[in-house]
Regions:
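Exported/periplasmic ABC-transporter solute-binding proteins
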Residues: 28-152
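N-terminal secretory signal peptides that target proteins for export/translocation
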Residues: 1-7
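Classic N-terminal secretory signal peptides
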Residues: 7-17
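C-terminal segment of classical bacterial N-terminal signal peptides
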Residues: 15-26
Length: 152
């Protein structure tokens, strides 16, 4: 009986490890990222290319014409690496290198930083031109989802 319990425990541990390992759909299902804006921004939807242009400093306005205020997250929580990986298929080191070159050459400055999803929502809900990204389950009625990164 002890042997059976031990075997069942090991199998369960293996299943959980595999199910929640990076790269599996179960691991990321709870953290699907969405791009959000202020509901008063006049933006209904945006493409990946439009969002990329704003977060990489190539576009300065939202499709509605309002000056864009992109809100990035610090690298601490993992959402930032996931966002850039899903949006432009780049590692965070590559994105940081890109911004270092632009800053050094005086051609741009990176998006404003927020510590976590709650802070992103606070900033976006209080600024008409703000755009950010959060896990789907963090988005609430104070913001509008304009792009679901998991569905494209």
């Amino acid at each position: 009986m002890k042997n059976l319990i031990s075997i069942v425990g090991k199998i369960l541990a293996l299943i959980l490890t595999l199910a929640y390992s990076p790269g599996t759909s179960l691991a990321y299902a709870a953290t699907d990222l969405v791009v959000i804006v202020n509901p008063a921004s006049g933006v209904e939807k945006m493409s990946r290319d439009e969002v990329t242009a704003i977060f990489m400093g190539r576009a300065k306005r939202l499709p509605s014409g309002i000056t864009a205020l992109p809100i990035d997250q610090t690298a601490n929580g993992g959402d930032k690496a996931k966002f850039y990986g899903e949006l432009i298929n780049k590692e965070l080191a590559e994105v940081n290198s890109y911004w270092a070159r632009l800053i050094f050459s005086g051609q741009g400055s990176p998006p404003r930083q927020a510590d976590n999803a709650a802070e992103v929502i606070e900033i976006v809900s209080g600024n008409k031109g703000a755009i950010g990204y959060v896990p789907r389950n963090s988005a609430d009625k104070r913001v509008k989802i304009i792009l679901d990164l998991s569905s494209q």
